[in-house]
C-alpha cells in the first residue's frame, strides 16, 4: 500500500469545551487509546480562547506523537506550529493556502458528499479528503448525508494518486459501534467528536475506534 500523507486511524475532533485543562486531559486519554491525529475545531469560541487552546494543544500533540491540525484558521495553525489545517467550503481556497503556506502544512478539506469537489481538491494538492456525514450526527444534525459508497468511490480516486497518497477521512456520527463500517467501506481515518470525547471512558473509546483500522488496513 502506498504511504499516506495523513495518518490512518482515529482522528479526534475537539468538542466545544472552554475548559482547557479538561480538554488537554481528554486528548491525553485519547492518545493513550491510539488516536493518531487531532483537529482543534472551535466554532463557538472567541478568538482569544481559540488561540490559547491551539497554543496549548500544539506542544502536547508533539509530545504525544499526534498530528495536530486547526479547523478553518490556517494562519493560526502556522502561528502555533501545527502540522496542518482543515478547510471547509466557506473557508480559504486550498490552492491559495498551499501557495502561501508551502508544502510543509498538511491540508485537509471537507468534501461533504461531492466526489467532483474531491477530484478538484485532490488535483490542488489536498492531503486528505473528508466525507460526511456518514451517520446521523449530533454535532451537525442538518448536514448532508454521504453514504458509505462515497468512501469506496473516493478510495479508488486516491489510490490513483502518486505516493505518498492522500487519505480518505469519514466524519459524522461515528462511534466505536459503527466505525468498522467506514473502515471496511474504504476510509483511511475516522473523524470523531462526541463518540470519542463524550464517551464515559475516552481511552477505551479511542482504542475501539483505532482497532477498526488495525484490522482493516
Curated annotation (Swiss-Prot):
One GO location term (cellular component): cytoplasm
Q: Does the keyword Repeat apply?
A: no
Record-level Gene Ontology MF annotations: magnesium ion binding; thiamine-phosphate diphosphorylase activity
Q: Any idea which positions bind 2-[(2R,5Z)-2-carboxy-4-methylthiazol-5(2H)-ylidene]ethyl phosphate?
A: 137-139, 173, 193-194
Annotated keywords: Magnesium, Metal-binding, Thiamine biosynthesis, Transferase
Q: What is its EC number?
A: 2.5.1.3
Query: Mind telling me which Gene3D superfamilies this protein's record contains?
Result: Aldolase class I (3.20.20.70)
The residues that the entry says bind Mg(2+) are 72, 91
One GO biological process term is:
thiamine biosynthetic process
Its pathway? Cofactor biosynthesis; thiamine diphosphate biosynthesis; thiamine phosphate from 4-amino-2-methyl-5-diphosphomethylpyrimidine and 4-methyl-5-(2-phosphoethyl)-thiazole: step 1/1
What this protein catalyses is: 2-[(2R,5Z)-2-carboxy-4-methylthiazol-5(2H)-ylidene]ethyl phosphate + 4-amino-2-methyl-5-(diphosphooxymethyl)pyrimidine + 2 H(+) = thiamine phosphate + CO2 + diphosphate; 2-(2-carboxy-4-methylthiazol-5-yl)ethyl phosphate + 4-amino-2-methyl-5-(diphosphooxymethyl)pyrimidine + 2 H(+) = thiamine phosphate + CO2 + diphosphate; 4-methyl-5-(2-phosphooxyethyl)-thiazole + 4-amino-2-methyl-5-(diphosphooxymethyl)pyrimidine + H(+) = thiamine phosphate + diphosphate
- Domain of life (superkingdom): Bacteria
Which prosthetic group or cofactor does it need? Mg(2+)
Report residues binding 4-amino-2-methyl-5-(diphosphooxymethyl)pyrimidine: 39-43, 71, 110, 140
The record lists the membrane-crossing segments as none
Copy out the cofactor comment.
Binds 1 Mg(2+) ion per subunit.
Main function: Condenses 4-methyl-5-(beta-hydroxyethyl)thiazole monophosphate (THZ-P) and 2-methyl-4-amino-5-hydroxymethyl pyrimidine pyrophosphate (HMP-PP) to form thiamine monophosphate (TMP).
Which NCBIfam families does the record match to this protein?
Answer: thiE
Could you say which protein family the record assigns here? Belongs to the thiamine-phosphate synthase family.
Name of this protein: Thiamine-phosphate synthase
| Protein's organism | Bordetella pertussis (strain Tohama I / ATCC BAA-589 / NCTC 13251)
The opening ranks of the lineage are: Bacteria, Pseudomonadati, Pseudomonadota, Betaproteobacteria, Burkholderiales
